[in-house]
Amino acid sequence: FELNGGVLHTMALAGTARVEEREAFGADEKEIREHEFVAQTLLAKLSDLGQTNRHSRDIMELGPLVHYHSAIDVELRKKEPIDRLVSLLHPTPALGPLPRTAETLGDLVAWRRRLGCPAWFGAPFGLFMDGFCEILVGIRMIRWRGPEVEVPSGCGVIEESRLVNEWRELRLKRESVRSVFGV
């Protein structure tokens, strides 16, 4: 998110396909629903902070992948501490459980540990300077373990998910990172 002059700008970003599949992706009801879980959760969390404005859902191209994207702006009623905004917004259902409770977050950490996944996947980081703040969440990464390179990835699983499609999405995300780093 970006915070500038009492206005918070953030986005819902969820649903993934290859850029070559953009047209079919635009009508994929499962991917739209997955995106809407994220967008609606953000709106619900932000509505108490001020006047919210959700922009139209569009498709954002990021390298070889496309994702559904909805910009969200909030005119804050009062100044909010940055750490409160980070904890309010992170993780969204794109990276974490829904509903997000201490129990479901604990379950996610336990599953990640059991699967050998890094517990710190999707960490927020940012810059705060002269009243301006920008916080990003790093969701694509590589990790070295001695001579080996790991490229973790995740996907949103909802009731309509099909296992073969989710495995494909995981592979697409890892391939996009590998191509950037040449591994």
What does each of the following model-derived ranges do?
Residues 9-111, 182:
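Contiguous alpha-helical scaffold segments within structured protein domains
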